[in-house]
């Protein structure tokens, strides 16, 4: 029997959710591994770096509640239990309408291609971003460097902020993590007894001056200075330059740039959206290419509401729809499963927490059994994290 070849590029949230929903959830992984070795209709290959990082936990590096070891997993064992081949390579090109994947170590053909390759960040929008800012978007290395620099300071001015890419009509950025980082920084400095020696500023050109709401209230309660509507024209060493050529003192900057597509997206046969991302439709199908799918923060949405994100939980919903559509296509059935738009996350402030939620069908999270604001939500968030990481490590 000739097996259908499925190639998955990337080993982050979107790719792992796709695998989870495409294959049966194994209750007994050893039996499942044996069964897939004896009989499988598919030959699945994952191309990536083999390291999974649980990015939603990165802000908690600031309080010392999370560290690199706790949130990083060698994903090769997860794949091996499912009899999935892993290729430790960097994809350099995609050709032949998606059928040919070229890496730095070889070429791989496929019948179905799934793209969960992650984004690139618009670090050239503001000069000096690469040289003079740190970001949770860059992973544990950058967050550890931020903590080290913070710990070396006895006092100072810290700026936290974000920018989003609005060209595709939705929130293509990671503002939520930055709100969390700001509140956790306030908590960490208070725990050390030095909060009065630091100014914390929060800025974003994508928040209107005078904007109000629950998040703004939480920032103001903590004495965080709001620079809504502000965007520096350049980051400098210890300073930020304004458009009138004046300067603001900034001893430390934690900043999340807007999201766009990687060089692979721009330079391959993949269609590109206005915002520079993979142009995908409401079924997760890459437009104009047969049997090529994408999910996560590498791909645009089709006609999205302006508030929708595309990473983490939204990646899960889209990957689930893609898995169903790929199964239907391989079985000769219509691929017509769409996905709901949803923003759902718990904002941990250490001494408080909020469940931020919006959805296209107005359904509350988990049938509204959890409060929208309670410190107990931190425990709920930790349970979700521990369950998912346990699943990846052992099931």
What are these regions (language model features)?
Residues 2-7, 83-180, 184-191:
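FAD-binding core/adjacent interface of flavoenzyme oxidoreductases
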Residues 173, 295-341:
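A conserved FAD-binding loop/helix module that cradles the flavin
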Residues 130-154, 248-316:
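FAD-site-proximal beta/loop scaffold in flavoenzymes
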Residues 167-184, 212-222, 311-318, 346-358:
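Short, electropositive alpha-helical surface patch
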Residues 2-84, 167-209:
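Beta1-alpha1 glycine-rich phosphate/pyrophosphate-binding loop at the start
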Residues 9, 108-120, 249-258, 319:
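Short hydrophobic core segments
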Residues 42-45, 82-101, 186-280, 333-334:
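A Rossmann-like FAD-binding core segment of flavoenzymes
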Residues 323-395:
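C-terminal, flexible cofactor-proximal segment of oxidoreductases
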